[in-house]
């Protein structure tokens, strides 16, 4: 498993990958910080579960609240990226080649996922820092007070928000990887993933409010938002953890039992 992690990190730490990731992360962080601050409501109460107000952003955790609000809208993107990363390994025959050197399939799968999540964790940390810095510069233009951002409470909130977003990414990653391992076809896996996490869950939610308490994508959105009117963050966390456990078991069993012929 260690060898698999190292091998995957070699691919991820190539100069081209690092440059593209750094530029994309910086652009995303600055742009979304500006969008969140501009869209902040002047009222004392949020107009939606994922909205922010000038008052809420002026609290100690306001700086990283900008970050969590921004990334909460990128769930489908994260889901699709992990589907593609795993499904392409089948279409390119990479898994078949890797199994010649690491025949223990579950360790191979776990090693690849661990490396990707470790890389994602580093990218998230950088994104949070850049978003916070950009928000600190832009906040005065929207009458957002930033004095309490630089405090122990602000630091504690930053760590808490980082942990929440990391779990959010891990949830999408595991669900996306499981779908890719079961389906294997890149076009089909992407079609299912985009349709489900994109319009399907939200269309069903419009007709059936209880869907927010059961669908994984909606639960992940609720968790990273700190809870919604339909489901608390704690319930979302527990339910998503259950889904992730089941998805991981299905993916591991499927990968271990089925032939890798491509």
Can you say where each PLM-predicted feature lies in the sequence?
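Helix-capping/transition residues at the boundaries of transmembrane alpha-helices
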Residues: 11, 87, 98-100, 176, ...
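Hydrophobic/aromatic positions within or immediately flanking transmembrane alpha-helices
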Residues: 22, 96, 109, 190-191
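Membrane-helix interface segments
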Residues: 17, 104-106, 110, 185-188
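Aromatic- and glycine-rich beta-strand/loop motifs that create alpha-glucan
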Residues: 1-27, 184
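Secretory targeting signals
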Residues: 18, 22-83, 109-181, 199-202, ...
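Transmembrane helix boundary and interhelical loop/hinge segments in multi-pass membrane proteins
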Residues: 82-101, 105-106
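Junction motif at the cytosolic side of a transmembrane helix
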Residues: 242-262
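Short hydrophobic, aromatic-rich alpha-helical segments embedded in or entering the lipid bilayer
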Residues: 208-228
């Amino acid at each position: 498993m260690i060898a698999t992690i190292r091998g995957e990190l070699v691919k991820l730490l190539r100069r081209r990958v690092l440059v593209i990731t750094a530029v994309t992360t910086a652009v995303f962080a600055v742009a979304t910080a500006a969008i969140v601050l501009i869209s902040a409501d002047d009222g004392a109460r949020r107009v939606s579960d994922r909205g922010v107000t000038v008052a809420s952003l002026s609290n100690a955790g306001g700086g990283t609240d900008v970050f969590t609000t921004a990334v909460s809208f990128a769930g489908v993107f994260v889901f699709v990226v992990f589907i593609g990363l795993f499904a392409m390994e089948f279409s390119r025959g990479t898994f078949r080649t890797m199994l010649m050197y690491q025949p223990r399939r579950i360790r191979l799968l776990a090693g690849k996922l661990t490396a990707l999540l470790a890389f994602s964790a580093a990218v998230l940390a950088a994104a949070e820092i850049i978003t916070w810095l950009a928000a600190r510069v832009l906040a005065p233009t929207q009458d957002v007070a930033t004095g309490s951002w630089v405090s122990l409470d602000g630091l504690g909130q930053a760590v808490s928000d980082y942990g929440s977003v990391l779990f959010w990414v891990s949830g999408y990653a595991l669900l996306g990887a499981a779908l890719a391992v079961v389906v294997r076809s890149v076009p089909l896996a992407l079609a299912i993933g985009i349709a489900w996490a994109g319009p399907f869950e939200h269309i069903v939610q419009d007709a059936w409010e209880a869907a927010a308490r059961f669908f994984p994508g909606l639960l992940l959105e609720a968790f990273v938002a700190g809870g919604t009117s339909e489901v608390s963050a704690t319930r979302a966390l527990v339910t998503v953890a259950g889904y992730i456990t089941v998805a991981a078991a299905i993916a591991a069993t499927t990968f271990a039992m089925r032939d890798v012929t491509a």
